[in-house]
Amino acid sequence: MSMRTIAVTSAFLVAAVVVSAGTAGATPARPDHDPATGRFDQPHQGFAPAGTVLRDGTPQQAGLDPGPIDAAVAQLNGWTRDDPTTGHPLYSGQVTLLAHDGVIVTKEAAGYALRYADQQGGLLPTTEQIPMRTNTIFDLASLSKLFTSIVAMQQIQAGRLDVDATVASYLPQFASNGKGAITIEQLMTHTSGLPADPTPPLWQDPDMASRIDSILDTVPQFTPGSTYLYSDINMIALQLVLQKITGKTLDVLVRDGITRPLGMHDTMYNPPASLKPRIAAEEYEQGPGEPQRGLVWGQVHDENAWALGGVAGHAGVFSTVDDMAILAQTILNGGTYRGHRIMSEQTDAQMLTNLNQAFPGDAHGLGFELDQRWYMGRLDSTRTAGHTGFTGTTFVVDPVSRSFALQFSNRVHPSRNWGSTNPARRAAADGLANAMAVRAPGGVSWYSGIGDASTATLTTPAVTTTGEPVSVDYATFVDTEPGSDLVTLQSSTDGTTWSDVPVTATGPGAPTGTVTTLSGGARAWWRVHATLPATSGPLELRWRYVTDSLYTGRGVNVTGVRVSDASGPLFDGDRDQQAFTGTHWVLTDR
């Protein structure tokens, strides 16, 4: 195992050791006794207690505001109804499960697992339609990559696989066409330079042997390690390595190493026909350039996985939200659930540590995607992990708040061409993030609100300065899209012309030095100080929060505003809260 890989996990593990030191023989966690429960501004370090076991509860029992969760579920359910603009829903049906600190705070199903009679959206007779249920089984699509990666990490942990070794050292044929230098790590972080998909697709090859040769003889698109390119071929190649070193097929490795010990009884490749009524239907494949499969229902949707017999490193796993909740909590617990450990804390940490720092925006651990706001929404952070699946599945695990959001839809039923479901992916995570509290040190704060392409301002009353430099001090909580959604302190002597004020911030994750804008997602309160040049006459201050057209964080909170000069206090924002003028800003206690 790479010493470099071990080193990058050390900070995570130090925190994990502190957290887990007292958890031997622990009973299931009681989230209502944790002072950080329900808090968005109390980031956890390390893993949850190893004894944390999921239990059903209400948002209130987890310290959450039920309003944002109810609103998110209503929106997610609403997308199962026909849109007047498109004439069809965003997806046929969906199931959402949200959990915080070991409490499943909502689990809702809406729409249909089977609804359509053809690719154009003709409806089946009502008697043949199948409603979506919370125990519906979904084709996970690329969420399957997480299972392949966990199996690989188990083999690395056991010393049978070296993350720094070349793939060709296990599969000599893989060295063909200049691939000899590609490493196992590069497969797992999508930095191998391999193309996204096999060309031609594997189902066009005549037999299994030729399909395997197609993978092994792939021509790279880029030099290994030179770029990030998400590739299904990476995970299929990893599958072949795992099968070579263990002598077992991937489905057996997943069953024996993950699903059986964790009790994930509804998780499998190639589900039996007896389960078909519980499985969400998918696409009608009958167009040009597609295998003529008709309605894909109960078989893997991905054509390359189908060509590999339904068991593939990149796709093929079927599961429910309940089973995937167990996997999510296992990750949060440091690799264990109900006393069944599937990997060590160090191994778990390596899956959650960014190894792609050379490729900003494409953060990736050994298996998990990291810090992807486009589907992680307001749960996003540098430590938030997850994956999506083409069929409509979304898996987001946030160790910072010990929360996870699962949003599964059958978006490809009846056609893959009905549009993106990324708004739904974010909505589930946003609802959970918005339900958590941001509690100001003094009890209440001014809150910016949330919205794309919006501007919110919070303005002090005019104060009279005395010709001395003016000091401004306040506390702020900033959770915004880094570098894009910015909050700025501004000053004006006439109420019309505004100038940016340089500030310094202190606290976990605060920017270094003097800056004119604040953004990011440290999930911690910062103390902010600014000094304005000596001036005489009226002076107003305002906080201006501007968002771009896509993606927002939890927003901005401001409290404890103090304006003073050498003569003494000029304005105390806590004593005179109603003196502020807020446009889209509101007073809140959470």
Predicted features along the sequence, with ranges:
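Short, conserved phosphate/pyrophosphate- and ester-handling motifs at nucleotide-, phospho-/glycolipid
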Residues: 65, 145, 320
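Short, surface-exposed loop or secondary-structure junction motifs
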Residues: 34-50, 108, 113-115, 119-120, ...
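Active-site SXXK
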Residues: 70, 74-80, 96, 102-110, ...
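Acidic/histidine-rich, surface-exposed loop or edge segments in extracytoplasmic proteins
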Residues: 49-61
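Short, glycine/proline-biased beta-turn/loop segments that scaffold the active-site neighborhood
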Residues: 162-178, 260-262
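Secretory targeting and sorting signals
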Residues: 1-28
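A short, well-structured edge-of-sheet supersecondary motif
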Residues: 64, 76-131, 163, 202-204, ...
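Beta-sandwich/jellyroll recognition modules and their flexible linkers
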Residues: 70, 348-355, 372, 378-383, ...
